[in-house]
């Protein structure tokens, strides 16, 4: 099933279970402004929650600490898939704070919160790359540095392309984390996920993404979707998701990826993937993080243009 079907007005036709069995509805809105709507029945939610926490434990190993969420809370945007997935991590932490409120992010407040947790908790920074990059740029521009803790992580989800089309360099991002947060590259973990699927691919300590063992990735020839390409070759990603009990279990995404050949240096088995780009034919070039950035930048521009009346 082409993933674009989830954006159509007839997306309810994808359901293989009655609407009264649907427990949860999740959305992701990219640059087109059209929401992709994914509905999950109770059985899917039950198994997906267990599966996602298993992935978090395997690749992040978090069971305590403090989470600085550089993103809005689920209270503000309860239906956004990216926020929902990141918020699940909060259940493994001792405490957490959301630093984006009413579409505004104040880096000074985020830094003050990190400093208040110093010597009390292992501090983790969690959010989409563009917002964590803003925090890093603030540290760079003000000449400030902080030293995170042993076991600290920067955890990203939401894609590396900004709404302007500009890419955030992963290499530059890693170097900035090392320079301004005192965090080695193996402490930076990126997550690939789709609201339309229950898949989650998380970086290991070598920054290679491991695919959830309960799904199967198939990479298809870009010129002939009936043909599967060998590992190491790029193509269009298809996902077989047996946890999707109310929606199609096989979807064709608009992402270009490759499967990493050979054995994993981490010793883990299973599929590993490298994300390359969004397909040129796609009407979207980003996910909900891109739309969030666009809205936040619009809010900041409106505030800057508003005259102060004494």
Where do the model's predicted regions map?
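Nucleotide 5′-phosphate-binding alpha/beta core
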Residues: 1-73, 79-82, 91, 103-104, ...
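Active-site glycine/GP-rich loop and adjacent strand/helix microenvironment
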Residues: 65, 88-310
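A general boundary/transition motif marking the beginning of the first structured unit of a protein
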Residues: 73-74, 165
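Conserved nucleotide-binding/hydrolysis micro-motifs of P-loop NTPases
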Residues: 74-75, 196
């Amino acid at each position: 099933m082409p993933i674009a079907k989830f954006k159509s007005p007839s997306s309810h036709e994808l359901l293989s279970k009655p609407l009264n069995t649907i427990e949860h509805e999740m959305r992701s809105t990219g640059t087109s402004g059209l929401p992709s709507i994914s509905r999950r029945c109770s059985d899917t939610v039950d198994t997906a929650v267990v599966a996602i926490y298993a992935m978090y434990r395997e690749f992040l190993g978090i069971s305590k600490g403090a989470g600085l969420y550089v993103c809005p809370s689920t209270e503000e945007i309860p239906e956004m898939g990216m926020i929902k997935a990141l918020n699940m991590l909060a259940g493994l932490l001792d405490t957490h704070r959301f630093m984006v409120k009413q579409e505004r992010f104040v880096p000074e407040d985020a830094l003050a919160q990190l400093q208040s947790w110093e010597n009390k908790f292992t501090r983790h920074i969690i959010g989409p790359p563009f917002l964590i990059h803003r925090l890093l740029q603030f540290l760079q521009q003000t000449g400030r540095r902080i030293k995170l803790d042993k076991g600290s992580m920067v955890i990203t989800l939401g894609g590396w392309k900004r709404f302007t089309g500009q890419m955030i360099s992963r290499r530059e991002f890693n170097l900035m984390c090392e320079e301004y947060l005192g965090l080695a590259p193996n402490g930076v973990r990126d997550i690939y996920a789709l609201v339309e699927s229950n898949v989650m691919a998380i970086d290991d300590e070598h920054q290679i993404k491991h695919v959830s063992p309960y799904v199967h990735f198939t990479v298809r020839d870009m010129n002939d979707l009936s043909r599967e390409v060998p590992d190491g070759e790029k193509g269009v990603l298809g996902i077989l998701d047996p946890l999707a009990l109310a929606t199609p279990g096989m979807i064709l995404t608009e992402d270009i990826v490759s499967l990493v050949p050979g054995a994993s240096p981490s010793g883990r088995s299973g599929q590993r993937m490298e994300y390359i780009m969004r397909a040129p034919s796609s009407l979207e070039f980003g996910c909900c993080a891109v739309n969030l950035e666009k809205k936040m930048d619009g809010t900041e521009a409106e505030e800057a243009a508003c005259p102060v009346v004494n």
